[in-house]
Amino acid sequence: MSDLFSLNKEKKNKIVYTNYSAKDIEVLDGLEPVRKRPGMYIGGTDSNAMHHLVSEVLDNAMDEAVAGFASIIMIKMHQDHSITIFDNGRGIPIDNHPKFPDKSALEVILTTLHSGSKFSNNVYHTSGGLHGVGISVVNALSKHFKIKVYKQGKLYSQSYSKGAKLTDLISAEASKRLRGTSINFTPDPEIFSEKLHFNPKKIYEIARSKAYLYRGVSIEWECEVEVPSDIPKKALINFPNGLKDYLSSKISLDNLVIPEIFSGNIESTVDDIKLEWAICWQNNDTSAFMQSYCNTVPTPQGGTHEQGLKSAILRGLKAYSEMIGNKKAANLTIEDILETASIVLSIFIVEPSFQGQTKEKLVSNGVSKLVENIIKDHFDHFLSSDKVLATHLLEHVIAIAEFRRNKKNERNISRKSVTQKLRLPGKLADCTRTSAEGTELFIVEGDSAGGSAKQARNRETQAVLPLWGKVLNVASSTLEKIINNQAIQDLEIALACGSLKNYKKENLRYEKIIIMTDADVDGAHIASLLMTFFFLRMPKLVEEGHLYLAKPPLYRLTQSNKIYYACDEEEKIKLTYKLSKASKAKIEVGRFKGLGEMMPAQLKETTMHPEKRSLLKVTLEDVQNVDKIVDDLMGKKPEKRFQFIYEQALVKMDQIINKLDI
């Protein structure tokens, strides 16, 4: 492979050994790690990552507001594409830091990772923010960064560039009525592209989202650059009724099933929780949505707070139906109830636990039951206070449930008739569910992997098909070879949907088709061959979103009788570092040779359990050119593959070099 990255065709077999000593070990000081690896701190260097800088500064201002110290926040986009964010809170401390007596606390916060007042509950009871690194990361990634602190009749200011101090802390007289913190910054084009600038609409939406999450805060918005017609140049963003106001602005009030929005705002000092929600039901599901937050941080993957809300609504409606003697609601599911519901949920708790670094899913223990009990109590009162309204809502969700069951019965009849006509492959371990909805087919290679998968599966919803023989590369094979290939025959029979022009989605026997191969290079090759089959023989199946790739682990790490898994070398290195920092106990690393080597329980836990696994959804971004792309990469002409690899290598070379630790 290394030959692809060199124009020199002369092969050199001589190995040159160099000294490797302490001087070769690189130690990064201060904010250097942020500038060298920005993706580790803000998730990348694209537009989303750049706008995350605004969210981070705004989160700090919001924390002052949530704690009750600020009531006004100002956001201004300037003509030079810089942005200023101000809050009238207490102002960042400017006295000398006890640990660094020659530096102000302000300078320590701006130049030191993992510094601030959010690591204890003494200053902020609840807070958002990113990874505990906060404003120092914004400073490190800004070409210009100027901070002003209004405190006790004084104005303190300081300037930075790329994380380095340009001026000492300057003090000047100011009005005693002024207090708070003002930050002006411009992202560094060396980190982000020079073509990237802040998007006014995106910043405005970020500001709106923060304002409705805390009803006591007003955000003053001003933009000097040109804005879209649907974004104001100046505005006072304020939602006095919080989430209820926000939900009302997002929906059509004329399209509601019931005229009332079920909302609440509860703060409990006993349970250390602040909870707010707003729910409405509409006459169709085209505009239904669910947004949830924890400490103003969006949680698009949900979590324990969403689980609590769903349980409360389901229990509440079922209890009401029992009270009025309506037996049709006995088999209601939460999917029926929320089919046409639009929901906004916000929770503030102490020391929340999130899944992953990007904080997209809340996993705090005890939150689900707490949220369920609070919302269930209020939902019971909501339903009992207006029985006409409650009965109408109940009839609406029962109608949805009956429609779902009727469709399921139709699919069952269709699927049974298809199944009865088929002679299914002998190696197929089919699932017991008769409808395609919620079912999965795992495609594995060989009996060894198939045996483990069959034991690990959920027999009701998960089928396993071990492929016999070599998986054919359909891009370089004749039609005769494709038709006569045993593995392809088994696959097409099991799917039952036909191929090419004969493809019929209504005959597809499974909702998800999951390619599950070994986590090594050989497994990736087999997965590529199978994807080639689907791209060329069943492109509609891919377009409709049925094809997935499983992510089995390649490594198993054991420390103090606890087992961890890593999908690749990079994840193994990160996990090893994390475990070694947390404990001095020995870490044992094992490498799986393949899926067949894994115990069924391990395979289920890591790769097949719907709530614990990770799946990659396969999509077609360029449908028109998919045949050409697949032919270049998988076809009969190796020179096309070489050309593709060579071109990609030239494009990526600088990035590869920058990622190497020497």
From Swiss-Prot:
Catalytic activity from the UniProt record: ATP-dependent breakage, passage and rejoining of double-stranded DNA
GO CC annotations, alphabetized: chromosome
SMART domains from the UniProt entry: HATPase_c (SM00387), TOP2c (SM00433)
Ranges for domain Toprim: 439-553
Alphabetized InterPro entries for the sequence: DNA_gyrase_B_C, HATPase_C_sf, Ribosomal_Su5_D2-typ_SF, Ribsml_uS5_D2-typ_fold_subgr, Topo_IIA, Topo_IIA-like_dom_sf, Topo_IIA_B, Topo_IIA_B_C
The EC number(s) this enzyme carries: 5.6.2.2
UniProt key word Ribonucleoprotein: no
Cofactor: binding details: Binds two Mg(2+) per subunit. The magnesium ions form salt bridges with both the protein and the DNA. Can also accept other divalent metal cations, such as Mn(2+) or Ca(2+).
GO BP, sorted A to Z: chromosome segregation; DNA topological change
Cofactor(s) this protein cannot do without: Mg(2+); Mn(2+); Ca(2+)
Binding sites annotated in the UniProt record for Mg(2+) 2: 518, 520
Pfam family, one: DNA_gyraseB
Binding-site residues for Mg(2+) 1, renumbered to this chain: 445, 518
Residue positions binding ATP: 20, 60, 87, 129-135, 359
A molecular-function term among this protein's GO annotations: ATP binding
Record keywords, A-Z: ATP-binding, DNA-binding, Isomerase, Magnesium, Metal-binding, Nucleotide-binding, Topoisomerase
Site (Interaction with DNA): 470, 473, 525, 641
Domain of life: Bacteria
Subunit structure: Heterotetramer composed of ParC and ParE.
Family assignment from sequence similarity: Belongs to the type II topoisomerase family. ParE type 1 subfamily.
Free-text function comment from the UniProt entry: Topoisomerase IV is essential for chromosome segregation. It relaxes supercoiled DNA. Performs the decatenation events required during the replication of a circular DNA molecule.
Listed name of the protein: DNA topoisomerase 4 subunit B
